[in-house]
Regions:
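Periplasm-facing N-terminal accessory domains of Gram-negative outer-membrane beta-barrel systems
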Residues: 15-129, 142, 183-185
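Periplasmic N-terminal accessory/gating domains of Gram-negative outer-membrane beta-barrel systems
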Residues: 82, 86-101, 107-212, 217, ...
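Outer-membrane beta-barrel translocator/receptor signature
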Residues: 186, 199-206, 212-296, 307-308, ...
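Periplasmic-side early beta-strands and strand-to-turn transitions of outer-membrane beta-barrels
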Residues: 259-349, 379-383, 588
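Surface-exposed extracellular loop regions of Gram-negative outer-membrane beta-barrel proteins
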Residues: 326-328, 378, 433, 496, ...
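Membrane-embedded beta-barrel scaffold of Gram-negative outer-membrane proteins
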Residues: 369-373, 379-380, 511, 554-605, ...
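Gram-negative outer-membrane beta-barrel transporters
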Residues: 478-483, 581-585, 604-703
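C-terminal beta-signal and adjacent terminal beta-strands/loops
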Residues: 685, 693-714, 728-733, 739-791
Length: 791
């Protein structure tokens, strides 16, 4: 532990930093005589679904931080003074200083603009989905471990596979979460990565195209997660308490507090959740699926001077859960030969991270940020003596040291940003298995489900560093009605292979004010590093003992070209329509596979993939009492043989070595996805909402027989699988929600929300991947309550 502290202090001493297209507003409110005024401030943007209430301090000042680039409506009010109502732009990382001079009400009238003026951001060069604190607070209920992924999955272009694994525009394991400016590139699904609770998140910004050059390595989609909250001007202790519960013995609690004294702000949060349906079960009966999760965080923020700011935080997260059984694992007497003990496999994940950032403003046009992180992550898989057909044990961990540095420069029409980053992961893998199925040949000379020559036991222990460095430069240029965002990024990756790459990025937008229209186009050259989950095992020569036929190829990084063309239009100053067409070309296309039908997976790669599609979304921020959205996604994805990386055993090895041509559907090739949610504000303190989701079904590749599938998963599941077409039957769910504000006084409130999900109680199969692993069934009809108090 001491060595990690030394390493963390070293990072803080280095000239490094980073990311996020966000700025800062420094507001001062005065009276007609120039003296400061304590006033109420409303800041909002319909384009960003953003609405915040602030108040200036006794000196008339207010600092609003972490504001995503965009156009905002600023409203300032104080009794006896005429209110101010105007627009303000945030398009620079440099603080925007703004002075509002209020006039005596009897002598002046307000400057009026309509809120609809913020429905479009004329300088946005790509479609970016943004979710703010209100959308997060009023979200539909989620099972533990999924509150954050569910929010992301509600956006166009994103799909769930089993167990809330996010797939942006057909990409496998290429999702990157950027938490308070620090990128997390490992798998953050409930089965592998402890969750940051959505109640602890202030805002989300989601990219699938036009991705800034400061982001790299995992490029299917980038999710900026902001957990930092502005301090209250009155310095009063404040926070939130949330209690929730519902179907599947689900219960949870969350608490967050924050206090400000002088130039210091201290915050803390904690949460705990439990459920009897943690993962997506493989059969409708939901066998062995209990899970508990928890997290705890502390943060400290100090404004050292008006130009220097220090932020420190530490977070600890954990999850413990069971692996769902299918029929033969739950009822060992049905196995061949019959068993006596029911299978129980468990997993646990633990993570502790410390983050530090420092900001210095050299001048009104130059700002430097430094950020660093140290992280310790471990995940385990254990099996009892009833595990079938294999008992697997896994004890993996990694330690990570990350730092970055960036400088932001405002010069005329240009917003320059340049930086460097280094990420060093020290991987440790410990895997072992014991085959519990019979390895004795039957009367036909065959064994099931493994080859008769499979070793009855196997173990692997390995360690290796994953070293990655990068540098970038980007420029946001304002040219009247045109906006250009151009960047260049260099990456170096060293693990199983050693590679460098240079990636240009370019996006452009044109605003047509008379038509309330923005058209945009983007090109992203991407360099994507493989998932490091069990990559040392898959790359080791030790695996050659598993079968007479083993194909072992080093997993190369993916190289790709992303194109997007789109438009955004405002209609009647009430709702906004976004439409995009995208096309992705990727070499060494990343995918994954399981180790001998266990719950442990590893990366593989195919020669190339071509993925294209279209997305559309209608956003209705507010119209009378209504608000909501409707989105549609169309995607076609194909991957091409041969395999170019990974581990292949038995028949898979033979096929991998001989199948050199042809293509097949990408695992996320769901042609049609529709999502909708509409909310009606019945009265000021009571609202109702309805939502639905339709998916045309994912493809699957099943190597077993119909009889085997029936024995493993039962008739209900098999009836939802189209074996002839190789696709899962369409999914559909209809949801209802209602919310009431039970109490409201000044900054204190008490809210109650009720949700009914999958009201139609349809058996929705999310994924069907083969024998003993990969199936995923969505929840049946379920009910949830959430009580939230703010003080």
């Amino acid at each position: 532990m001491r060595s990690w502290l030394h390493l963390g202090l070293l990072f803080l001493a280095l000239p490094l930093l980073a990311q996020s297209n966000a700025g800062e507003l420094r507001l001062k409110v005065t009276g007609p005589d120039g003296l400061p005024i304590k006033a109420s401030v409303e800041l909002s943007s319909d384009a960003l679904q953003f609405h915040r209430s602030f108040s200036t301090d006794d000196s008339g000042q207010l600092i609003a931080r972490n504001l995503s680039f965009g156009l905002y409506r600023l409203q300032v009010q104080r009794e006896s003074f005429s209110p101010h109502d105007g627009l303000i732009e945030i398009h620079s990382a440099l603080p925007t200083e703004y002075v509002v001079k209020l006039s005596i009400a009897a002598l002046s009238t307000a400057v009026n603009v309509t809120a609809d003026a913020t429905l479009l951001d004329p300088e946005r060069t790509t479609t970016i989905n943004h979710l703010d604190s209100k959308a997060i607070a009023d979200r539909p209920a989620s099972l533990p471990g999924r509150s954050l992924p569910d929010l992301v999955n509600s956006q166009p272009g994103w799909l769930y596979e089993g167990n809330a694994v996010l797939h942006p525009r057909g990409s496998e394991y290429q999702t990157q979460f950027v938490v308070d400016g620090i990128p997390l590139t490992d798998n953050r699904s409930p089965s592998l990565g402890p969750e940051i609770e959505a109640d602890d998140v202030d805002s989300l910004t989601i990219y699938t195209a036009g991705i800034p050059a400061e982001y790299g390595r995992k490029m299917g989609g980038v999710i900026e997660v902001n957990t930092l909250r502005d301090a209250r001007a009155d310095g009063v202790l404040h926070g939130d308490v949330v209690l929730s519960g519902g179907s599947f013995d689900t219960a949870g609690a969350f608490v967050r507090v924050q206090d400000t004294f002088g130039r210091n702000t201290v915050g803390a949060s904690a949460s705990g959740n439990m459920t009897a349906r943690y993962l997506n079960p493989v059969v409708p009966e939901n066998y062995t699926n209990r899970g508990t999760i928890g997290d705890f965080s502390l943060s400290y923020d100090r404004d050292i001077t008006p130009t220097d700011r220090l932020t420190l935080s530490v977070r600890h997260e954990l999850s413990r859960f069971e692996i769902p059984n299918e029929q033969l694992q739950q009822f060992p007497q049905l196995q061949s030969p019959p068993g006596t003990t029911r299978q129980l496999q468990t997993r646990d994940n633990f993570e502790t991270m410390g983050l530090a950032s420092y900001q210095h403003i050299f001048s009104p046009n130059v700002l430097v940020n430094l950020r660093g992180m140290v992280r310790d992550n471990s995940n385990d898989l254990n099996s009892n003596n009833g595990a079938w057909p294999i008992a697997a044990f896994l004890h993996n961990e990694f330690k990570e040291g990350y730092f970055n540095a960036a400088v932001s420069i405002h010069h005329g029409r240009h917003e320059w940003k340049a930086g460097v980053e280094s990420d060093n992961l020290f991987l440790h893998e410990n895997f072992s298995d014991i085959v519990t199925a019979s390895l004795t040949p039957d009367q036909n000379g065959a064994c099931y489900p493994f080859d008769c020559a499979t070793p009855p036991s196997f173990s692997f222990l390995g360690s290796r560093p994953d070293l990655e460095q990068s540098a970038f430069v980007q420029d946001l240029v304002h040219l009247g009605k045109w906006t250009v965002n151009a960047g260049l990024r260099w990456d170096h990756y060293q693990l199983v292979v050693n590679q460098n790459a240079v990636s240009p990025r370019f996006s452009v937008a044109r605003h047509f004010p008379a038509a309330s229209l923005i058209v945009h186009a983007s090109y992203d050259r991407v360099f994507q590093t493989p998932s490091f989950e069990n990559i040392l095992l898959a790359s080791s020569p030790d695996v050659t003992v598993l079968n007479a036929n083993v194909l072992r190829l080093p997993v190369q990084p993916s190289h790709g070209n992303y194109f997007e063309f789109g438009a955004t239009k405002s209609f009647h100053d009430r709702f906004r329509f976004d439409a995009n067409y995208f096309r992705r070309y990727v070499d060494n296309y990343a995918d994954d596979d399981q180790i001998l039908s266990t719950a442990a997976s590893f990366p593989i790669a195919f020669r190339k993939a071509i993925i294209y599609g279209a997305e559309g979304k209608v956003d209705l921020p507010h119209w009378n009492r209504f608000s909501g959205f409707l989105s549609y996604s169309y995607i076609v994805g194909n991957a091409w043989f041969p395999v170019t990386g990974g581990l292949f055993i038995g028949d898979d090895a033979v096929n991998g070595a001989t199948q050199l041509t042809g293509h097949f559907p990408d695992s996320q090739d769901q042609r049609n996805t529709v999502r909708a949610r509409i909310r009606y504000q019945l009265m000021s303190r009571l609202w109702f909402a309805a939502g639905s989701e339709y998916g045309s079904g994912l493809p699957f590749d099943f190597t077993g027989t119909y009889a085997q599938a029936l024995a493993e998963y039962g008739q209900q599941v098999v009836d939802r699988i189209n074996f002839a077409d190789g696709r899962i039957s369409p999914t559909f769910s209809f949801d209802l929600s209602a919310g009431a504000e039970l109490y409201k006084k000044e900054t204190r409130s008490l809210r109650l929300q009720a949700d009914v999900e999958n009201l139609n109680n349809r058996l929705n199969i999310l994924n069907f991947a083969g024998l003993f692993s990969g199936n995923a069934i969505a929840p049946p009809r379920s009910y949830f309550l959430r009580l939230a108090a703010t003080f």
